[in-house]
Amino acid sequence: KYLKQKDIKEIMEKRGNWKEFKPNNKTKKNPDYIHVDQHYSNDKSLWKYKAPLKSLVDLNSDSDSIDNKFNLVENLKKLNNNKLDALLLKQYKINMYDLNKNINKIKDYQSLFHNSKVWIFKFIYSHGGENIIVLDSFDKFKEYVLHCIEVNKNKWENLDYQKYKNIGKTKKGHYFIEWVLQEYVDNPLLYENKKFHLRGYFLYHKTDKGNKGYVLNNHRIFTAKQEYQKNDYLNKLIHDTHFHSASKKIDFKPDISEVIGKVNTTKIEEQINLLFQSILKIIKTPCFPENKYCYHFFASDIIITADYKIKLIEINKSPGLPTENYTNEISDPNFIFQEIVRNIVDKHYTPLNPPTIPEKNYFIEL
């Protein structure tokens, strides 16, 4: 959906070693390489093909090491790295099913809101900014929890909770049981007086020699619509950051880096590299049995504090790329696909005409 057939063909044919696979070819039943974006990741018509290299990994067999909002941070903490821990937000897992059985347990979280501490509360299996709320008092937290229980408790009446633990993430999403209360960054670095976050891209490559990772050396900047203030937390125009909220297309380099200077830019990039090197260590995601090699395209959401420390918000396993009106060079689907082919596909199938590394924006190996 993001890529056009003619653009894919041009990118591959330039290398001099690729031909388009023909499904009716009787002498070659399987392609050597399959790439699908998020819109075709569940296309059953492709399941019959056994390509040595494919752009899908078996996330369901990985015990949620990366795309689960709560487990990702907990797994990173297990690396026992103080520098890494400084990049992670405090968090608590909230089980609505348990609270419904004993609502008095909600008092266990009251102390978290002392000294006007602000938290963001989000459903673990949500995406696209849904089921997320910022809370600045225990009373508001309690009110939201009670509302959520009231709306969903009928689903839980006949639920076999032991079976629930073993069902897939999509089905779990129907029950709204597992939530995470995550520390809210209330001292963000601002751009033109607006809150923003970094949207980055990360490639995970599974080979027979171990895991490899690549991170884009630049980031899109998603801003809030209105200028930042430390209150009115339910006002999404102030506190929600999205690509369509920005009045112009903004990147970390040069837009932010020119404002904060070379020293702070380097400091931030070093933290980003440490974060993704660590993420690469905890991923155990295998290929599907029919593929010898595989890779996956992830997006990351990172916020920078006023003292130039990064904080990981989450990793997105199915990142939607901006539409044509909002895209730019580093989020352009053709650019990303070319970099996937250069960094991963060309390693398996050596091109006759190797491409050059882009001058400014490119993926670097971790």
Q: Across the structure, where does each feature detected by a protein language model lie?
A:
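A short acidic/small-residue loop/turn micro-motif
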Residues: S318-G320
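Catalytic core of tubulin tyrosine ligase-like
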Residues: N115-S116, I124-H296, I304-K311, N316, ...
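Catalytic-loop signature of eukaryotic-like protein kinases
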Residues: D301
